[in-house]
Amino acid sequence: IDNQTRVCHATTPPAMNAAFGRGAMTGSWYNLKKAKLIWIEGSNLAECHPLAMKRVMEAKDNGATIVHVDVRYTRTSRVADHFFQLRPGTDIVFLGALINYIIQNKKYDADYLRRNTNAYCLLRDDYKFDAGIFSGYNEKTRTYNKETWGYKVDANGKPVKALSMSEPGTVMDRLATHFSRYTFEKASAITGMPV
């Protein structure tokens, strides 16, 4: 017998630990009702997590905007303020185009990024990402040596931060370079969603 615990939630803690430093939920369902914008992607929350959807609907009643991105129209789509339908397997391209737009048009909170993220940190000069492969890849063993994936560090071993996120070699600079290829036109051609 298969169940949601193994299929869905078993992979969540390792991914969250890698992304956020801990494998537990980063917010509470209760706080969802206080949101101004709720983005639901690749999930039919109304049917898969009805208690979470209850909080989403409370947020909507409080004026929140609900966005649903999925390959199919569902009960979640029906209550969303905006529904974006993608071709299966094209979510990353869609998100890449949004990330590119946000970076190119400076639609981010620079102060938040400075205080709470690694956007200003300088990456090592030997870090590379060429043709979809990170530096340190050993073709023979098909494994990575992740040594080059770190930051430039000072004499105390602490990451060196630039004065500007746009300085060459910062995490934000590399992020902007990587996502620059994800234009709305390219995303539209791949996802099937009009520009």
Q: Where do the protein language model's features map onto the residues?
A:
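Short, amphipathic alpha-helical segments
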Residues: 26-29, 46, 50-53, 88-92, ...
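Gly/Ser/Thr-rich beta-alpha loop segments that engage phosphate groups in nucleotides
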Residues: 23-25, 44, 194
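Anionic-ligand anchoring segments at beta-strand to alpha-helix junctions in alpha/beta enzyme folds, i.e.
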Residues: 1-34
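Long, well-ordered, tryptophan-enriched scaffold segments
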Residues: 63, 72-195
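A short alpha->loop->secondary-structure connector
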Residues: 1, 59, 88-90
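A conserved hydrophobic secondary-structure block that centers on an alpha-helix together
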Residues: 27-75, 83
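Short low-complexity, flexible loop/linker segments enriched in glycine and/or proline
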Residues: 16-19, 56, 82-84, 100
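Short glycine/serine/threonine-biased micro-segments
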Residues: 19, 40, 190
